């Protein structure tokens, strides 16, 4: 069972940093920094998150994000919010970052986390830039404790296929791949030489005969790119073995919410093992 994480700056009563170390008005422009900031920031410190943070299909903290004004990553609107710190991801449009910097606003960029260790690194980084080191340390301790419980469990690893729109898959050097590995599943992408992302043709997937096929939940509206995950071959594989349609919001960002994704995959692994003679 995943214990409730302490959210929205109320991190289990952790003490706040000295006032001189704390930026008073922080704006986040990126979905992943949005969530880390909501977890670590002190009361009233975070003044805006990106509009994507309110999207329940993408954000694990959509309900919490409703309490914050949103921005659309535009330099002009962010400048008018009068922030003394802007936090964002490394893939944010460089023109926006450069404009804010020229306007005298400090911008800190976060690299995406692709491993469990990098998740704790990003939490620590967020604590440092917000002047909330003790809050971040408390969150890291909670995350590491729950993660260790998953990693302690050993056993045979069922073969799992991550299969998304257009036949896209992710290897072990991605966050999704690390979620599978931590949950005790073997990612078949490695069998085809994928450490990052790549495409597995449908016929190759059929011949691979994975023990489970894991797909993303479809977005509203019809998309040709998603038709492949509804192909009869996929249906046949699903009927033969337990399968899963994952909650994308828990898998997108390197935050403590990956624990929920791991928990789901552990449950899937146990179901497969129970069904295997």
What are these model-predicted stretches?
Residues 24-25, 118-128, 137, 212, ...:
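Structured C-terminal subdomain patch of bacterial secreted/periplasmic proteins
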Residues 1-8:
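Sec-dependent signal peptide recognition
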